[in-house]
């Protein structure tokens, strides 16, 4: 088997995730996420572990650290610009979005180089 089948280098710059609604249909929300398995992902994870804030807070910090941008997110008719603080607030407020980001970042297949 060719080792290129294990190349998840796309996770170092980020891959776009389309958020699904409650009916599993794609929305306009796109979140650019780094791979949990990449160099930056491991670095973000180790920093969260060192801070020892507890499992839930550490998971939140990792997700925020792996999120590098987005589009299509609005709240009360106002477009939200990406920032780590805003990502943290969204993930705390909207767990359905947070869960999709967490699952996506953990799945190495999402970051295979095409």
List each model region and its residues:
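Short, surface-exposed, charged amphipathic helix/loop patches that serve as local interaction elements
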Residues: 23-114
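Short, intrinsically disordered N-terminal pre-domain segments
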Residues: 1-12
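Short acidic-hydrophobic surface loop/beta-edge motif
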Residues: 13-24
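Exposed, low-complexity/repetitive linear segments and helix-based recognition motifs
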Residues: 4, 18-20, 58
């Amino acid at each position: 088997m060719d080792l290129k089948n294990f190349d998840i280098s796309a996770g170092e710059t980020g891959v776009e995730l389309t958020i699904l609604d409650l009916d599993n249909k794609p929305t306009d929300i796109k979140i650019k996420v780094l791979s949990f398995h990449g160099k930056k992902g491991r670095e973000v994870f180790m920093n969260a572990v060192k801070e020892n804030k507890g499992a839930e807070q550490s998971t939140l910090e990792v997700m925020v650290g792996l999120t590098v941008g987005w589009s299509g997110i609005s709240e009360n008719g106002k477009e939200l610009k990406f920032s780590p603080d805003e990502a943290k607030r969204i993930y705390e407020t909207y767990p359905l979005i947070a869960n999709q980001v967490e699952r996506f970042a953990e799945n190495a297949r999402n970051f295979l180089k095409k």
